[in-house]
UniProtKB/Swiss-Prot annotation:
Record-linked PROSITE patterns: RIBOSOMAL_L10
Any one Gene Ontology cellular component term annotated for this protein: large ribosomal subunit
One example of a Gene Ontology biological process annotation: translation
Similarity-based family: Belongs to the universal ribosomal protein uL10 family.
Protein name: Large ribosomal subunit protein uL10
PANTHER family named in the record: 39S RIBOSOMAL PROTEIN L10, MITOCHONDRIAL
Subunit structure: Part of the ribosomal stalk of the 50S ribosomal subunit. The N-terminus interacts with L11 and the large rRNA to form the base of the stalk. The C-terminus forms an elongated spine to which L12 dimers bind in a sequential fashion forming a multimeric L10(L12)X complex.
CDD domains: Ribosomal_L10 (cd05797)
UniProt-recorded Gene Ontology molecular function terms: large ribosomal subunit rRNA binding; structural constituent of ribosome
Entry keyword Metal-binding: no
Family matches, as InterPro entries: Ribosomal_uL10 (IPR001790), Ribosomal_uL10-like_sf (IPR043141), Ribosomal_uL10_bac (IPR022973), Ribosomal_uL10_bac_type (IPR047865), Ribosomal_uL10_CS_bac (IPR002363)
The species this protein was found in: Kocuria rhizophila (strain ATCC 9341 / DSM 348 / NBRC 103217 / DC2201)
Length: 177
């Protein structure tokens, strides 16, 4: 690349791609600087929202092995690079777009898999990772409790039967003596 500034920008974008497991491409046409600042704040610490140059982003994505943005890099573009919970970032973008319809989600990727606008909306409708994990843990705990009760039922029945048999044998032994 002839221009060192452009080479540095591509290197920075490649670094952002490599340090994030998800990214959401948006068009921000019509948003003010104050609105972009609000969006960055809403995304939190686990996501970085960067206004990008389309050509340099295409080069960085291609060099990073990311094909999710092919054909979508047109107009004023910005990317939310997500290193934390992708569901929370998608929710933040969805909520911001409700109040600011100028923000348009174009697509993205999650763990190397390309996602279109509708898939990102579905991602935003999911519950957070912590809630999903707690539901799985609760279901597993309930299943284990049921299994333990099933295993204990025959065991306790066997113990009661053995106690009754021993009592009967003791009773017969006392009567014989």
């Amino acid at each position: 690349m002839a221009n060192p500034e452009k080479a540095a920008a591509v290197a920075e974008l490649k670094d952002l791609f490599s340090n994030s497991h998800a990214a959401v491409l948006t068009e921000y046409r019509g948003l003010t600087v104050a609105q972009l600042k609000t969006l960055r704040r809403a995304l939190g610490e686990n996501a970085e929202y960067a206004v990008v140059k389309n050509t340099l982003t295409a080069i960085a994505a291609r060099e990073s092995g990311i094909e999710a943005f092919e054909g979508q890099l047109n107009g004023p573009s910005a990317i939310a690079f997500v290193s934390g919970d992708a569901v929370e970032a998608a929710k933040s973008l969805r909520d911001f777009a409700k109040d600011n319809p100028q923000l348009v989600v174009k697509g993205g990727y999650l763990d190397g898999v390309a996602m279109d606008e509708n898939e990102i909306k579905k991602l935003a409708d999911l519950e957070s990772r912590e809630v999903l994990l707690s539901k799985v843990a609760g279901a597993a705990k309930a299943s284990m409790s049921k299994a333990a009760a099933l295993f204990q039922a025959p065991l306790s029945k066997t113990v009661r039967t053995a106690d009754a048999l021993r009592a009967k044998l003791d009773e017969q032994g006392e009567n014989a003596a």
